[in-house]
Amino acid sequence: MKTNLRYLFFILICILLTSCTRYIKPEKFDLDPQLLKSLKSNVPIQVLVPKNAETKYLIEYSGWRPMLGKIYIDLNDLYHNAKELIEEVLVKNKVPLSTNSPKYLKFTISKVQWEHWGGGFSIGAYLEFDIETGDGYKRHYRVQDQSSQNVDRAVGGTTSRAVEQIFQDEKIITYIESN
């Protein structure tokens, strides 16, 4: 009996020490059209995101109590979603896209975090990113989103919030509309 208890105790310790590791795939969500400013341009622009980004990026837990589990994401998935959403806004506003245009918007992620909200009934996620234009303008943003379901949805939603933030920036709108 004591031997069985020792084995059980040993197994429990191993489980607690290794904790849980999850790899998530962020979803892509629609943008809120009321938050997007209209723009107009006939000058081609390209959207740049890092290629071959980190495939096993640890999403930092920013809550007050330590978490045993770790959540990882492939940053290429977030970049893919962000690029698609930015290009969708440009195309919807009839701004031509070109992969070799000197005019560009460059989107770079600097940090992804998550935490429990509302006593654990909701999950919040934060995305810090930089947006840079071809004329040298650069701005750092931190956006957030939440989900009552899971981290995947909360992190995926931050990409939509980031793109909405980009297209509210007057300097970016002016740059896109300039010749």
List PLM regions with ranges:
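A generic structural signal for short, solvent-exposed coil/turn residues
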Residues: 12, 37-39, 99
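Structured segments of extracytoplasmic/periplasmic soluble domains
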Residues: 85-96, 165, 169, 173
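Sec-dependent bacterial lipoprotein signal peptides
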Residues: 1-20
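Surface-exposed short loop/turn segments
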Residues: 21-31, 88, 92-150
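A structural "domain/chain start" motif
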Residues: 20-79, 84, 174-179
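Short alpha-helical linear motifs
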Residues: 54, 127-129, 165-169
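Short secondary-structure boundary motifs at beta->alpha junctions and helix caps
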Residues: 63-76, 134-177
